[in-house]
């Protein structure tokens, strides 16, 4: 099949909605919440116009949305939803249940600060609150990645050695409402790539009746959690295989992380999401000035790519970690994960922790440069949490 792409200028929300259109899930249940709302608005239009045959369920809350897709997935349907911030927090109970039931649900999460005070703009507090829920978590830098990851996530979630739900994270407003060029793949090619869902133990298979969600006490609960752990570990084996097939089909290469100008870099910055575009801009500037700097974008936050970080960051002079979320009373989430991964390497770099952009505060090139300059000048202090763009 010929790979002919359509290059269009769209928002991240429209890009994700079009990926959902091409996937054509059996069921989508959703409740509107800023800045996720345009995703389900676009998709609801596809349903109303008869473009897709998806059963669209408008529910009264995000708790109900996740409950509905859990029920649909357990019945054997390919099910999706989308949310942001307080909506994800309201889902919290059922988010854990979806993972523990091993249901291959795909959920775009348009990242927004959690209340309070109430805030509708971007940070990663919503996703970080669910990082231990058992969901695979992918983070997009661009609208193209948000589109691609939505498609790729279906295959990853439904793989027989994984069977775990996936969150596709895209930064609120920055990506969801920002317009960028995106290459849409042919509908037939996407449908061929995602294939047909092969349900496991569906409730509607009356020839093989099963019970979902029974009481699971100390006689089996522990073993079931161990199975979840093993499934998450399997992602590290399965993801490269699916990513390779994605590259062969669509021409784009994905991995757990994306190194940028890392070949001889002495000082490296690590971050999630759209901020990586600004980091790359500053890396290019500093390279022109003769500084050996680079960046490492984390595409997959859960499971955390520990081995890849150890390989790429061992022996560097310094590593600066940027977090768009905090963990009150502890180290920032991404910094904590990077620090833990590098504890085992032979030549540990100096580490620096920087929190930025809470509540949608802009992160500017001069902020990135300041953090790099601290690293270059040897001014990093391990475990000292610093802040970029904060009035103090």
Swiss-Prot record:
Which enzyme class, named as a word?
A: oxidoreductase
Known SUPFAM superfamilies for this protein?
Answer: Thiamin diphosphate-binding fold (THDP-binding) (SSF52518), TK C-terminal domain-like (SSF52922)
Entry keyword set: Oxidoreductase
GO MF annotation terms? pyruvate synthase activity
Q: Does the keyword Ribonucleoprotein apply?
A: no
Pfam families per the UniProt record, alphabetical: PFOR_II (PF17147), POR_N (PF01855)
User: Per its UniProt record, what InterPro entries does this chain match?
Assistant: PFOR_II, Pyruvate:ferred/Flavod_OxRd, Pyruvate_synthase_PorA, Pyrv_Fd/Flavodoxin_OxRdtase_N, THDP-binding, Transketo_C/PFOR_II
Q: What's its EC? A: 1.2.7.1
Sorted alphabetically, the Gene Ontology BP terms of this entry are: response to oxidative stress
Q: Which reaction does it catalyse?
A: 2 oxidized [2Fe-2S]-[ferredoxin] + pyruvate + CoA = 2 reduced [2Fe-2S]-[ferredoxin] + acetyl-CoA + CO2 + H(+)
Domain of life (superkingdom): Bacteria
Record's subunit section: Heterotetramer of one alpha, one beta, one delta and one gamma chain.
The protein here is known as Pyruvate synthase subunit PorA
Provide the species name.
Thermotoga maritima (strain ATCC 43589 / DSM 3109 / JCM 10099 / NBRC 100826 / MSB8)
